[in-house]
Amino acid sequence: MSYIPYVVEKTGRGERSYDIYSRLLKDRIIMLSGEINDAVASTVVAQLLFLEAEDPDKDIYLYINSPGGVVTSGMSIFDTMNYIKPDVCTICIGQAASMGAFLLSSGAKGKRYSLPNSRIMIHQPLGGARGQATDIQIQAKEIQRLKDTLNGILASQTGQDFATIEKDTDRDNFMSAEEACSYGLIDEVITKHK
């Protein structure tokens, strides 16, 4: 269990204590840290929906430091980012790998950023199957469908053609922030807060 700091905000009406993530949420900042699973995705989706309800015309900032995770969990975040009205600006801090990189590239065009020493990694979805031959065939067909879906979206987001994405995601493909910018996963490498 990691330590979560609290901050105290003083107002004319007294003091209020927030955990740091709740305080950042007041500034429309969502932190996506660690592995992406159903619990993390549910929290991020809820925060996106809450911030849209608060102000549908104001950008949301999604900071990403993630090794990736479950494809379906990540897709729930992706779909929500596209469903809500506000632009979602994505910023890589540390690393955005696998589904983390996919979500980084899914930010609003022109608003996808990385800090200079971050690393970004894309690859094909991982999976495993056990059971009877028919069950394994079903799972193989589904992972191929997910791979094609993800590659199609990445092609659209980066401006790369589908064949290039398919080749470049065949194995782990690590990029610096500058390389990710040239590739089209992000729009700009930033060193100072805008």
Swiss-Prot record:
Keyword vocabulary terms for this entry: Cytoplasm, Hydrolase, Protease, Serine protease
The protein's assembly and partners: Fourteen ClpP subunits assemble into 2 heptameric rings which stack back to back to give a disk-like structure with a central cavity, resembling the structure of eukaryotic proteasomes.
UniProt-annotated catalytic positions: 98, 123
Subcellular location: Cytoplasm
Family, per entry: Belongs to the peptidase S14 family.
Name of the protein this chain belongs to: ATP-dependent Clp protease proteolytic subunit
An annotated Gene Ontology molecular function: ATP-dependent peptidase activity
Cellular component GO terms held in the UniProt record: cytoplasm; endopeptidase Clp complex
EC number: 3.4.21.92
One Pfam family per UniProt: CLP_protease
Source superkingdom: Bacteria
Its biological purpose: Cleaves peptides in various proteins in a process that requires ATP hydrolysis. Has a chymotrypsin-like activity. Plays a major role in the degradation of misfolded proteins.
GO process terms (BP): protein quality control for misfolded or incompletely synthesized proteins
Native organism taxonomy: Bacteria, Pseudomonadati, Campylobacterota, Epsilonproteobacteria, Campylobacterales
PROSITE patterns in the record: CLP_PROTEASE_HIS, CLP_PROTEASE_SER
Reactions it catalyzes: Hydrolysis of proteins to small peptides in the presence of ATP and magnesium. alpha-casein is the usual test substrate. In the absence of ATP, only oligopeptides shorter than five residues are hydrolyzed (such as succinyl-Leu-Tyr-|-NHMec, and Leu-Tyr-Leu-|-Tyr-Trp, in which cleavage of the -Tyr-|-Leu- and -Tyr-|-Trp bonds also occurs)
